[in-house]
Amino acid sequence: MFKQFAQHLPEGWDEFAGFFAALGDPTRHKILLIFEPEEEICVNEIAAVFDISRPAISHHLKVLRNANVLTCEKRGKEVYYKVNYDYCAKVLTLTQHF
């Protein structure tokens, strides 16, 4: 048992905490699961799949983007999102060592 973590989180954990917090919502799980590997999807396409408002989808995308789970690129008037597989793999690999 790592009793020291009951008092203090490991160095660098703050970055990981945001990652795991972003994954703490079922809607965000569903958003991530609609992506095929290396696929880029625009906000309108994502919103069309769900029965919630576009502003709500945008909020969830922002949370995932701020946690580096998704990356985005603006093209004209559209914003395209893509799963940041490299970062997700890095976080999961590093947390195995705690």
Regions found by a protein language model. Name each.
Residues L32, N66-A67:
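Extended rod-forming repeat segments used as scaffolds/tethers
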Residues D14-S53, R75, V79-Y87:
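N-terminal helix-turn-helix DNA-binding core of bacterial DNA-binding proteins
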Residues M1-L23, A67, V83, A89-T95:
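N-terminal leader segment of winged-helix/HTH proteins
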Residues F98:
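An amphipathic, aromatic/His-enriched active-site/gating alpha helix that lines ligand/cofactor pockets
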Residues L33, H59-H60:
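Base-recognition residues in the alpha-helical recognition helix of bacterial helix-turn-helix
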Residues A48, H59, R65-N66:
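Alpha-helical residues within the helix-turn-helix
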